[in-house]
Structure formats: structure tokens, C-alpha cells
Amino acid sequence: MSFLFGGAPKMSSEQKIAAAETEVEMITDMFNRLSESCSKKCIPNDYREGDLNKGESVCLDRCVGKFFEVNIKVSEKMQGVAGQQQGGAGLSL
């Protein structure tokens, strides 16, 4: 009943494993979306060299930076919305 007083409820080992697996899936999905999006934007389909040139490297660096900035902003916004919903739910008792 610690969750009634602000503490997190105890999780069993199975729940912890399931939560960790979900987190790994989310991170893998984010990495795949990042790779696909930035590669599509920054690397041409006709490869001319074996290595990235300076323009491609700079483009990828900026793309990854923007991707993480947006990801952080969206996460913060969603946490704020979730907090408001939890706060509002407690007041309606």
C-alpha cells in the first residue's frame, strides 16, 4: 500500500524483467527510426565513396542532435500531461 503515500509499488522480478524488455524494445525502436530517418536525409542512394564525406557527417551529426532534442521535448511534455492527469484524478475523489 506504499503507492497510496507516493512511494512506488514493489515490483516482482518478472515485472522488472518485463519492464526492462519493454525499455530495450523502445530504445531499439528509437535507434532504428533515428538511423533510418537521418540516413535517408543525409546519405545519397548512389554511394560515391566508402566513407562519409564531411557534408554527410555534419548532416548526420545535426540530424541526430535534432532528433534527441525533439525526443526530450516530447518526453517532457508527455510526463507533464501524465502528471496533470494523475493530479487531476486524485482531486476527483
Curated annotation (Swiss-Prot):
A motif (Twin CX3C motif) lies at residues 38-63. GO terms for biological process: protein insertion into mitochondrial inner membrane. It is found in: Mitochondrion inner membrane. It is a peripheral membrane protein. The keyword Zinc applies. Mitochondrial intermembrane chaperone that participates in the import and insertion of multi-pass transmembrane proteins into the mitochondrial inner membrane. Also required for the transfer of beta-barrel precursors from the TOM complex to the sorting and assembly machinery (SAM complex) of the outer membrane. Acts as a chaperone-like protein that protects the hydrophobic precursors from aggregation and guide them through the mitochondrial intermembrane space. Heterohexamer; composed of 3 copies of TIM9 and 3 copies of TIM10, named soluble 70 kDa complex. Associates directly with the TIM22 complex, whose core is composed of TIM22 and TIM54. Interacts with the transmembrane regions of multi-pass transmembrane proteins in transit. This is Mitochondrial import inner membrane translocase subunit tim10.
